[in-house]
Amino acid sequence: MENFLLEKIINKKLSSDQYSDVVPNGLQIEGEKIIKKIITGVTACQELLDKALSYGANAIIVHHGYFWKNESQCIHNMTRKRLTTILSNNINLYSWHIPLDIHPKLGNNAQIAKKLNIRIKGYILPYLFWGTLEENINAFDFSKKIEKKYEKKPIHIYANAPIYISRIAWCSGRGQNFIKQAYNFGIDAFLTGEISEETMHIAKELGIHFFSIGHHATEKDGIKSLGKWLNNKYDLDVTFIDIHNPA
């Protein structure tokens, strides 16, 4: 498949033109015209680039790419090394950020719901999903379920919160600042990737369960599901590489 055709296909699937983003979505760096082997990952870090080379890939698709707004435009140090690796090896670098967070089937938030058996009911905000569990569940049992599904223990703030959870809101990645909007919507628990210093106090004083799983952990499954879709629909050679990141 040609590189710009792949971009067009994914842009259409993720409805990329509908979203304003803080980073370019699509083919960020043009490489070899014909795509032979694709590596997917969360972030286009140097380790992922090196792994892609070892796999003989000439295309990389990530959730966190390059050229973010308000980022320095100077090409120094690690930025220089990363770009040199990509350009000197004729690699295509693709990135989809917000479109891959909120796609109703492939997106990170949809995948969280799938993993934790949450019925998606709608959106509180464009990036803030809400839904219900199959049945009311003890909050500590739900915490254990998260640990089992994500293979890591979540941070769980529960002071003053109800014992059982029915209505839950969630946002992949850096969503901790949505906790008040989630509370105002009348949910029992809020789940996201990151936690800030003030989040504990807000959750405690509002009497709401707060779960932090990690930015990386909540944003692996979207890029994985996109890769599986490309493999199944277009028979492309796609491999997901998980670069360990506890944050």
UniProtKB/Swiss-Prot annotation:
The keyword RNA-binding does not apply. A divalent metal cation 2 binds at residues 64, 215, 219. It comes from the Bacteria. Keywords: Metal-binding. A divalent metal cation 1 binds at residues 63, 101, 219. GO terms for molecular function: metal ion binding. One of its GO terms (cellular component) is cytoplasm. Belongs to the GTP cyclohydrolase I type 2/NIF3 family. Homohexamer. This is GTP cyclohydrolase 1 type 2 homolog.
